């Protein structure tokens, strides 16, 4: 029977079929293949896998005939991938064998991770609750994308997870984007990133603003911005100069790391580029320079010299 994983109360129950679970298990074995080949003692698992009818007598003889332990373990992993119950039976065998118990935790964590990814994909593609199944959560139109976890009671984005919850803009409890830290009302980690908090309770913005970099949160009561709004990827502007300036953020200004726009104060900006687009700044007073002085320019590349050698 297929296992059911309800993502959130009130949402439709998204179900993984047996074929989905088999795909996840094969993906787990493939991802952990290098580690399993190095640590799996194949001779300890042949009897259990034969008893569970995962391997036939000929399969066990073929595994035993391999010259090295790594080749035997690799063939055993391949055979478990080809059987719908191979992953679970191999995990049971590792749990029962002395010296192989540490592999059980790795297999279970990989299974949970890829099950969550598969569930999120199916939940998004289902199109329920206004979600648009034709647009992934990194596209420009994310109006229907909501977070998997409950939203923060203070407003803004959810405390953990990713997604859009409130319209972008100067708001007392953050802007677009699900929080990536429990204390964050702002920053996002959807595909392509999102906007951090802007207002009195803005958290630390991380990631990109859909098409480009990110937008840092603004103090007071919010952490420094972890992403930089720039049009050339990566990025990290720090927090802007706060108005009014709180005691715990003295001389707080721009700065940060990454390509694109450089904010010249309060941090060590890198790779300064084009100035920010005026249409993207909701309040010009927030883009003022701080009082920490200009950031240093990136170092020049080393000079190349040509050396001549005589024979």
Curated annotation (Swiss-Prot):
Task: Give an example GO biological process.
Answer: symbiont-mediated activation of host NF-kappaB cascade
Keyword Membrane listed = yes
Limits of the CARD domain: 21-110
Location in the cell = Host cell membrane
Record field: compositional bias (Gly residues): 252-272
Q: Show the PROSITE patterns listed in the entry.
A: CARD (PS50209)
Q: Does the keyword Membrane apply?
A: yes
Annotated GO molecular function terms are: kinase activator activity; NF-kappaB binding; protein kinase B binding; transcription coactivator activity
Keyword set, alphabetical order = Activation of host NF-kappa-B by virus, Host cell membrane, Host membrane, Host-virus interaction, Membrane
Q: Where is the composition biased (Polar residues)?
A: 140-152
The record's Gene3D superfamilies line, in alphabetical order, gives:
Death Domain, Fas
Query: Listed GO cellular component terms?
Result: CBM complex; host cell plasma membrane; membrane
User: Which coarse location class applies to the principal site listed for this UniProt protein?
Assistant: host cell
Q: Which residues cross the membrane?
A: none
Q: Write out the ranges of the annotated region (Disordered).
A: 125-181, 203-230, 243-311
- Which InterPro entries does the record associate with it? BCL10/E10 (IPR033238), CARD (IPR001315), DEATH-like_dom_sf (IPR011029)
Domain of life per record: Viruses
Among PANTHER family, the record links this protein to: B-CELL LYMPHOMA/LEUKEMIA 10, B-CELL LYMPHOMA_LEUKEMIA 10
Q: What does this protein do?
A: Activates host NF-kappa-B and JNK pathways. Induces hyperphosphorylation and redistribution of host bcl-10 from the cytoplasm to the plasma membrane. The inhibitory effect of cellular bcl-10 on NF-kappa-B pathway is then overcome allowing NF-kappa-B activation.
How is this protein named in the record? Answer: CARD domain-containing protein E10
Give the species.
Answer: Equine herpesvirus 2 (strain 86/87) (EHV-2)
